[in-house]
């Protein structure tokens, strides 16, 4: 019976085992370091499915489990340390995969109980990678069916008899079979899918998070989302496993293998532009520093004029000019931004450095010169306004008239208005009424 079953299911088994590897690799593990790891988990998932369904039916999935004998060991490492798991997996999965064909007949596996136990232990999982090939061998598939039956029996009572009979590997492998083997829903046959669903969440919560973190460290954080998306889809690891190993991004991208490497390539360019922008911004900052020193020289107007109001006006003018000077610096920065794209940033930055208003856009420079004395630079305009105000008689009204340096004029006007309002406040404000006895009396009535 087993042989007939096998022959009938064999093509599907080969095809399916292939899919299984791929899907499994993605579903459970691909987030973990390498595609190889992924394969390992995937295959383990396959074998788990086998454990539940394959033994009784002798389907291709069972074939898969039987054929792969290595991964069990990898799994033994997996629960503790995903990193070592991935590295071990590459070597182990590869070597055992070769071993199975080298063994020639998997009959030896089926016949020898120790090997069948090893399969139950999850070693078989490792080979599930190559299960597609091995299953094509009818003799192997027969032996595999026998092995799978043992596996199923062991898996039903995982903690019990299988552990006793199997070698030391069995202990860890059994846990792996419980936790990891059934992780992939899509890989498992419909009968095992319910079990797989339960295990998938638990497995991802434990292993998936670790692998995500690992990816984040290696590939700068994008991976976290990608790997989650990839875990569900069956295509990420399919045909481009080698690519996945090299780029690391194709692995976890949600099935769009071509797009992910493109992302990586595109990412290389913006940093160069950002460097240019940063340089330009530094130049702009230097320009605004120069402007600030100019604005501080305009503060000299404060001390020279004895009038407090005037000093206030001139200092306000200085702060205003500093703002406009900062815009000069901004112009320099934006110029250098353009330079990052067109190569012209450096000249603009230098001009702004020198405090030359010609570096500004024409609109800004015209505004500055018209508000000041006509001198080209902002600090000079501030100085001119302050000097003229200081030389005039220091009454507030004269200061207001004479402080013609744009911002200074407005500041003086504001200052006089505030003074007059303050002087009137005692007569008009609520405080006056409270003080006056009659007013207070009336209010009480």
From Swiss-Prot:
<feature type="compositionally biased region" description="Polar residues">
    <location>
        <begin position="74"/>
        <end position="87"/>
    </location>
</feature>
<keyword id="KW-0238">DNA-binding</keyword>
<feature type="region of interest" description="Required and sufficient for DNA-binding and co-localization with nuclear DNA">
    <location>
        <begin position="208"/>
        <end position="445"/>
    </location>
</feature>
<feature type="compositionally biased region" description="Basic and acidic residues">
    <location>
        <begin position="88"/>
        <end position="97"/>
    </location>
</feature>
<feature type="compositionally biased region" description="Basic residues">
    <location>
        <begin position="432"/>
        <end position="445"/>
    </location>
</feature>
<feature type="region of interest" description="Required for nucleosome binding and for the protection of chromatin from hydroxyl radical-mediated DNA damage">
    <location>
        <begin position="360"/>
        <end position="445"/>
    </location>
</feature>
<dbReference type="GO" id="GO:0005634">
    <property type="term" value="C:nucleus"/>
</dbReference>
<protein>
    <recommendedName>
        <fullName>Damage suppressor protein</fullName>
    </recommendedName>
</protein>
<feature type="compositionally biased region" description="Polar residues">
    <location>
        <begin position="245"/>
        <end position="256"/>
    </location>
</feature>
<feature type="compositionally biased region" description="Low complexity">
    <location>
        <begin position="257"/>
        <end position="306"/>
    </location>
</feature>
<feature type="region of interest" description="Disordered">
    <location>
        <begin position="1"/>
        <end position="145"/>
    </location>
</feature>
<keyword id="KW-0539">Nucleus</keyword>
<feature type="compositionally biased region" description="Basic and acidic residues">
    <location>
        <begin position="207"/>
        <end position="228"/>
    </location>
</feature>
<feature type="compositionally biased region" description="Low complexity">
    <location>
        <begin position="61"/>
        <end position="73"/>
    </location>
</feature>
<dbReference type="GO" id="GO:0003677">
    <property type="term" value="F:DNA binding"/>
</dbReference>
<comment type="function">
    <text>Unique chromatin-associating protein that contributes to the organism's exceptional tolerance to harsh environmental stresses. Binds with a higher affinity to nucleosomes than to free DNA. Protects chromatin from damage caused by hydroxyl radical-mediated cleavage induced by X-rays or treatment with hydrogen peroxide. Suppresses X-ray-induced DNA damage that includes single-strand breaks (SSBs) as well as more hazardous double-strand breaks (DSBs), and improves radiotolerance. Also shields DNA against reactive oxygen species (ROS).</text>
</comment>
<feature type="compositionally biased region" description="Low complexity">
    <location>
        <begin position="117"/>
        <end position="138"/>
    </location>
</feature>
<feature type="compositionally biased region" description="Low complexity">
    <location>
        <begin position="367"/>
        <end position="431"/>
    </location>
</feature>
<feature type="compositionally biased region" description="Polar residues">
    <location>
        <begin position="1"/>
        <end position="15"/>
    </location>
</feature>
<feature type="region of interest" description="Disordered">
    <location>
        <begin position="203"/>
        <end position="445"/>
    </location>
</feature>
<keyword id="KW-0227">DNA damage</keyword>
<feature type="compositionally biased region" description="Gly residues">
    <location>
        <begin position="329"/>
        <end position="338"/>
    </location>
</feature>
<feature type="compositionally biased region" description="Polar residues">
    <location>
        <begin position="25"/>
        <end position="47"/>
    </location>
</feature>
<dbReference type="GO" id="GO:0006974">
    <property type="term" value="P:DNA damage response"/>
</dbReference>
């Amino acid at each position: 019976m087993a042989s007939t079953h096998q022959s009938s299911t064999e093509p599907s088994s080969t095809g399916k085992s292939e899919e299984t590897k791929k899907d499994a690799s993605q579903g459970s593990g691909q987030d973990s370091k390498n595609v190889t790891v992924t394969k390992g988990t995937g295959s383990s998932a396959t074998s788990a499915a086998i454990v539940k369904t394959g033994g009784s039916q002798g389907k291709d999935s069972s074939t898969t489990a039987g054929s792969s004998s290595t991964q069990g060991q990898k799994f033994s490492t997996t629960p503790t340390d995903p990193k070592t798991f991935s590295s071990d997996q590459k070597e182990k999965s590869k070597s055992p995969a070769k071993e199975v064909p080298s063994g020639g007949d998997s009959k030896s596996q089926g016949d020898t109980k120790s090997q069948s136990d090893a399969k139950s232990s999850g070693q078989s999982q490792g080979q599930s990678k190559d299960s597609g090939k091995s299953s094509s061998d009818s003799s192997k598939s027969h032996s595999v069916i026998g092995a799978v039956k043992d596996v199923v029996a062991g898996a039903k009572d995982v903690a019990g008899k299988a552990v006793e009979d199997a070698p030391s590997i069995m202990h860890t492998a059994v846990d792996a079979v419980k936790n990891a083997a059934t992780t992939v829903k899509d890989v498992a046959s419909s009968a095992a899918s319910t079990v797989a669903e339960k295990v998938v969440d638990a497995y991802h919560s434990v292993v998936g998070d670790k692998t995500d973190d690992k990816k984040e460290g290696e590939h700068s954080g994008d991976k976290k989302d990608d790997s989650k998306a990839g875990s569900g889809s069956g295509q990420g690891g399919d045909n481009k496993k080698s690519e996945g190993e090299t780029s690391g991004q194709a692995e976890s991208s949600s099935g769009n293998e071509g797009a992910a490497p493109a992302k990586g390539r595109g990412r290389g360019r913006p940093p160069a532009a950002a460097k240019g922008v940063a340089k330009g911004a530094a130049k702009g900052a230097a320009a605004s520093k120069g402007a600030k020193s100019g604005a501080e020289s305009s503060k000299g107007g404060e001390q020279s004029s004895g009038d407090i109001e005037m000093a206030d006006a001139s200092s306000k003018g200085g702060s205003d000019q500093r703002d406009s000077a900062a815009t000069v610096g901004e112009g320099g920065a934006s110029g250098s931004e353009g330079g990052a794209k067109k190569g012209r940033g450096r000249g603009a930055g230098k001009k702004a450095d020198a405090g030359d208003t010609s570096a500004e856009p024409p609109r800004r420079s015209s505004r500055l010169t018209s508000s000041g004395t006509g001198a080209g630079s902002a600090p000079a305009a501030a100085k001119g306004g302050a000097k003229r105000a200081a030389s005039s008689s220091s009454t507030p009204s004269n200061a207001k008239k004479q402080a013609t340096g744009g911002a200074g004029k407005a500041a003086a006007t504001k200052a006089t208005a505030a003074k007059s309002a303050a002087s009137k406040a005692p007569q008009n404000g609520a405080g006056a009424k409270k003080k006056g006895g009659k007013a207070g009396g009336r209010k009480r009535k």
